[in-house]
């Protein structure tokens, strides 16, 4: 089944861009980035910036990210996948990142949320960006990464 990503959430003041892979089924259903309550994204970022993002309404979450100069997007514009696991993504169509420098002139760091998104780190690094691959915020990754919270937190102290 073909799944489509969401539009980028960024503006001319964005300094840090977090790239996921492709929205989960729950996120697609809700039409929200990281809409699956089992995903720790909002908790991890909220902890790092000193905001209780997980208890905010979605639009307020996005406004808070923008206020903190954080943008969201996905590596993939679309892809086929049964279920929500990144390992099941096939027939990927990547987003067009060629215009980022013009659209987001203050962008200084691109972070990849998890291994699948991180496979495209060399592409963005090759475009001249500082990059970092972070442990996945997926709830399924919780037990595999002891330092996950500190790695996410370090990005925002950068």
From Swiss-Prot:
EC number, UniProt record: 3.2.2.-
Keyword Transcription: no
Superkingdom of the source species: Archaea
InterPro entries linked: Hypoxan-DNA_Glyclase, Uracil-DNA_glycosylase-like, Uracil-DNA_glycosylase-like_sf
Catalytic residues of the enzyme: 39
Entry keyword DNA repair: yes
SUPFAM superfamilies, A to Z: Uracil-DNA glycosylase-like
Keyword vocabulary terms for this entry: DNA damage, DNA repair, Hydrolase
Pfam families noted in UniProt: UDG
Enzyme class: hydrolase
A molecular function (GO) term: hypoxanthine DNA N-glycosylase activity
GO biological process: DNA repair
UniProt family annotation: Belongs to the uracil-DNA glycosylase (UDG) superfamily. Type 6 (HDG) family.
Descriptive protein name: Hypoxanthine DNA glycosylase
